[in-house]
């Protein structure tokens, strides 16, 4: 059996070597010739898997080690009888850590108290839902916009217009959809960007085209009061350099790139494939994850809560390093920039999640206990 897989998927041998030959290919280079004789195709979001790629091939199972599925033609899969699986929630915590690290950096730059801001989360799925839980756990004022969930479940949701009018911080966590009433392509167009509150922060760690990049560039040039954090780009791996230069933080689509998240994605696809072939899963991710480099932190009960929160978040993940690495690649030609975008992702250093961090509090501090619980860290 032949398994064609994106070369950047971790733990391929550990999970899939027992099933057959693994052929590793750069994700953007996977084409019809590559998959023609493949039985299984394993991809990430950089590979569009559709009729043009698969028709006439032997592929019967497609797995994407990502939360999103906008790069998969699910209608064609159903028509062709191809079983598929994504990895819902696999990197959700990594994205939450990215947003938290970004908030800590913005607060330091702007000199603001994060407790006094109003937060708007657009999209309450795997990522947005976890972020909402953390922010509310910290006792912060959070408003949520998710029209599909509101229609299906009811609940305490607000409109997009209310988010824009009332929120100081807006974090985007929607899938990318191009048609229908809930289309998210260019959800933030020039009109909505112009309507942002004075001094608002906009964070996009969802999909690049959710924000009109050209419009955002023009609005940032006009309104110096706004701050933008972008991890995703409309034409990636090509990046609008002039837009990146206007962002307070700019990174190459690595928000969810925690080691835990990447390996969790492979584990979920492995489980799905075992279900597909009717065999029990014999390999467990917990047996493969290495020990985190930062495993335990001690805080004195007298520690300032705002300082402790920033220290815990940025101790696990500080986006400024990724921002600096990314900006260095923007000095080359367009071709060099495109290549560097993928190199940064392929060679991304090991990064762990805050949920694996043990926190010891010396003495009694309800405020610190609240922070540790909200972050999902382990109190010891």
UniProtKB/Swiss-Prot annotation:
Residues annotated to bind NAD(+): 146, 174, 231, 256
Localisation: Cytoplasm
GO MF: 4-phosphoerythronate dehydrogenase activity; NAD binding; protein dimerization activity
Enzyme class: oxidoreductase
UniProt pathway annotation: Cofactor biosynthesis; pyridoxine 5'-phosphate biosynthesis; pyridoxine 5'-phosphate from D-erythrose 4-phosphate: step 2/5
InterPro entries associated with the record: D-isomer_2_OHA_DH_cat_dom (IPR006139), D-isomer_DH_CS (IPR029753), D-isomer_DH_NAD-bd (IPR006140), Erythronate-4-P_DHase (IPR020921), Erythronate-4-P_DHase_dimer (IPR024531), NAD(P)-bd_dom_sf (IPR036291), PdxB_dimer_sf (IPR038251)
HAMAP family: PdxB
Task of the protein: Catalyzes the oxidation of erythronate-4-phosphate to 3-hydroxy-2-oxo-4-phosphonooxybutanoate.
Protein name: Erythronate-4-phosphate dehydrogenase
Gene name in the database record: pdxB
């Amino acid at each position: 059996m032949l398994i064609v897989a994106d070369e950047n998927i971790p733990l391929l041998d550990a999970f899939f070597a027992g099933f057959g030959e693994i052929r590793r290919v750069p994700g953007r280079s996977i084409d019809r010739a590559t998959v023609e004789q493949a039985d299984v195709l394993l991809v990430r979001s950089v590979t569009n898997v559709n009729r043009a790629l698969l028709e006439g091939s032997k592929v019967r199972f497609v797995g994407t080690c990502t939360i999103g599925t906008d790069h998969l033609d699910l209608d064609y899969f159903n028509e062709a009888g191809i079983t598929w699986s994504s990895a819902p929630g696999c990197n959700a915590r990594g994205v939450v850590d990215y947003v938290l690290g970004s908030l800590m950096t913005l607060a330091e730059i702007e000199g603001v108290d994060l407790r006094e801001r109003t937060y708007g989360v657009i999209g309450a799925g795997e990522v947005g839902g976890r972020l909402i839980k953390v922010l509310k756990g910290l006792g912060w004022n959070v408003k949520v916009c998710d029209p599909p969930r509101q229609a299906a479940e009811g609940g305490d949701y607000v409109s997009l217009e209310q988010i824009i009018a009332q929120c100081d911080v807006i974090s985007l966590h929607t899938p990318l959809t191009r048609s229908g009433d809930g289309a998210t392509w260019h959800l933030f167009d020039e009109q909505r960007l112009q309507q942002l509150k004075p001094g608002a922060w906009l964070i996009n760690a969802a999909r690049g085209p959710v924000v009109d990049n050209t419009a955002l560039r023009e609005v940032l040039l006009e309104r110096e009061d706004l701050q933008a954090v972008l991890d995703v780009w409309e034409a990636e791996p090509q990046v609008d350099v002039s837009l990146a230069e206007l962002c307070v933080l700019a990174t190459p689509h690595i928000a969810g790139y925690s080691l835990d998240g990447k390996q969790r994605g492979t584990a979920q696809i492995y489980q799905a494939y075992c279900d597909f072939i009717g065999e029990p899963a014999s390999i467990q991710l917990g047996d493969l994850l290495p020990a985190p480099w930062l495993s335990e932190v001690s805080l004195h009960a007298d520690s300032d809560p705002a300082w402790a929160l920033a220290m815990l978040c940025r101790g696990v993940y500080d986006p400024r390093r990724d921002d600096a690495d990314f900006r260095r690649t923007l000095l080359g030609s367009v071709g060099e920039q495109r290549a560097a975008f993928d190199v940064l992702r392929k060679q991304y250093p090991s990064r762990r999640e805050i949920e694996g961090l043990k926190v010891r509090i010396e003495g009694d501090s309800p405020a610190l206990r609240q922070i540790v619980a909200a972050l999902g860290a382990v109190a010891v």
